[in-house]
Amino acid sequence: MIIYATAVQTINSFVKLESLKEVYGLIWIFVPIFSLVLGIITGVLVIVWLEREISAGIQQRIGPEYAGPLGILQALADGTKLLFKENLRPSRGNTPLFSIGPSIAVISILLSYSVIPFSNHLVLADLNIGIFLWIAISSIAPIGLLMSGYGSNNKYSFLGGLRAAAQSISYEIPLTLCVLSISLLSNSLSTVDIVEAQSKYGFWGWNLWRQPIGFIIFLISSLAECERLPFDLPEAEEELIAGYQTEYSGIKFGLFYVASYLNLLISSLFVTVLYLGGWNISIPYISILELFQRDQIFGTTIGIFITLAKTYLFLFVSIATRWTLPRLRMDQLLNLGWKFLLPISLGNLLLTTSFQLFSL
């Protein structure tokens, strides 16, 4: 009986140990996801503050200064205000489409962050088709905008949704062709492999120098995908009031506001990964890989800092562009996408393919 009781206790303790391991395993699954979401939220708050400060500097006026030191908490105050506002719904609108549209726009952009390498193998999902996964997921966002415009039962909202869909289709193709050129140079569709391929040759190995035409096209297409000036036709204030956002209020309006900055941040991160060497420091006699070998935590921190520094450099260019260039007409926007960017990006892809074939 003593042996039997001991065996039962051993089995029970083993079962408890296994259940504890499962619980800890589940916790450790959510830790990186929570860390990524927290970092994204912080990044968006910083972008909002930067945009207000930069726009104030360009327009020679005082920016936000009351909410926190230097107005750094202004975005948080605005978000809190929208959170407690009433959610209004159009009486004759399509309620399911009206409610689901903002969520689709935000979730599709959030999923794209899973393939971004912030440092050496510090990526939520290192997939072999990571770059194409981003393109596929980001193509879902305009569907949410179109649903929002149609579900609002408002002519301005519907026209804004149609413009968003047309603009996305027009600039998604040149952007994809530029990504194909990068994948040919790197012989991979993984974002980690693309960064490592650029780190072999240091600063001059960046795809910025190997693909200057593709970089310019990707830059323009990214701004158009983010619907930033001079490409903000879907929500042109003078023509469409607020476009597909016209009938929204409260937290749903705030979701569109967040989605635009999430899209801007993810576009800047992909510019860094594809063209600016990612976490690679690219300074002679200083190798980021040596830092990882000496101290992994220090090397990872340095890699994150380098990635974010390059990202916010591109963000500064995007914000400055918004406040310096006039808005295009709809026909000019479509002509630019279909008649100029598409043929040039296709020619760039064919040229890259030819060079790769001759170099074999």
UniProtKB/Swiss-Prot annotation:
Catalysed reaction(s) here are: a plastoquinone + NADH + (n+1) H(+)(in) = a plastoquinol + NAD(+) + n H(+)(out); a plastoquinone + NADPH + (n+1) H(+)(in) = a plastoquinol + NADP(+) + n H(+)(out)
Q: Is NAD one of the keywords UniProt gives this record?
A: yes
Locate the transmembrane regions by residue number. Answer: 27-47, 98-118, 129-149, 165-185, 203-223, 253-273, 297-317, 340-360
Which membrane topology term applies here? Answer: Multi-pass membrane protein
Q: EC number(s) of the enzyme?
A: 7.1.1.-
Q: What is its main location?
A: plastid
Query: HAMAP family under this entry?
Result: NDH1_NuoH
- Specify the protein name: NAD(P)H-quinone oxidoreductase subunit 1, chloroplastic
* Upper taxonomic lineage: Eukaryota, Viridiplantae, Streptophyta, Embryophyta, Tracheophyta
